[in-house]
Design a protein with these regions (language model features):
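Acidic, turn-prone loop/beta-hairpin segments
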Residues: 1-22, 50-142, 155-164
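Short helix-adjacent coil turns
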Residues: 25-32
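Aromatic-lined ligand-binding clefts that engage carbohydrates, nucleic acids, or primary amines
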Residues: 34, 38-39
Length: 191
């Protein structure tokens, strides 16, 4: 089944991460390889994807399609990340691999590097989500300003009104900004 756009965007990120991994691995550029993996985990996953989807895992019904899609993505993610981190964190990845029993191989080090499907490379989706991330960053700055002024406690107390031009409104059609920005409500208005 088709994954939601956020998961598709993250698969696009994995596609590019893997391309860079292969390039750096071939030329023994392990420092850059590790830096890119770390950046992906801290910025793309922790500060972005997990921040948005954690409530889906904890709060949505067990059978909800969004929760199922999140779990499908997380399963894809762990298998790929284990293979990418294996040359760098050999003992840690070996232990995780043995606990998860992903495949019948006795060791993560007997696995091939991931073969990422080319359809994960989606430049249109990347462009759209790069714009959404910019909007999210502006919204988060506004929320932090209100938080610093002690007008709100958490982002969930915020009700956003996002002013966009007509072109941007069409681009972001169907996006739930309250979920993207982790607020109680978000409305789009034409500027």
């Amino acid at each position: 089944s088709k994954l939601p756009e956020l998961e598709q965007f993250m698969l696009h990120k994995i596609y590019n991460l893997n391309l860079n991994f292969e390039k750096n691995f071939e030329i023994y550029n392990f420092h850059t390889l590790y830096k890119e993996l770390l950046n992906f985990c801290t910025v793309d996953l922790s500060a972005f994807y997990f921040d948005i989807r954690k409530d889906t895992l904890y709060c949505d019904k067990l059978g909800s399609s969004k929760r199922k899609s999140t779990i499908v993505f997380l399963n894809i993610l762990i298998e790929i990340l284990l293979k990418l981190f294996a040359p760098i964190l050999s003992f840690t990845t070996e232990e995780i691999y043995s606990l998860l029993k992903i495949n019948t191989n006795k060791s993560i080090h007997l696995e091939n590097f991931p073969k990422i499907p080319t359809h994960w490379n989606n430049k249109d989706l990347k462009n759209k989500w790069n714009e959404l991330i910019k909007i999210r960053e502006i919204c988060n700055s506004s929320i932090e300003f209100k938080r610093a002024a002690k007008e709100i406690g958490s982002s969930l107390e915020a009700n956003l009104i996002i002013n966009l031009n007509e072109k941007m409104i069409k681009l972001v059609e169907g996006v739930d900004f309250s979920e993207l920005c982790i607020t109680s409500d978000a409305k789009i208005e034409k500027s």
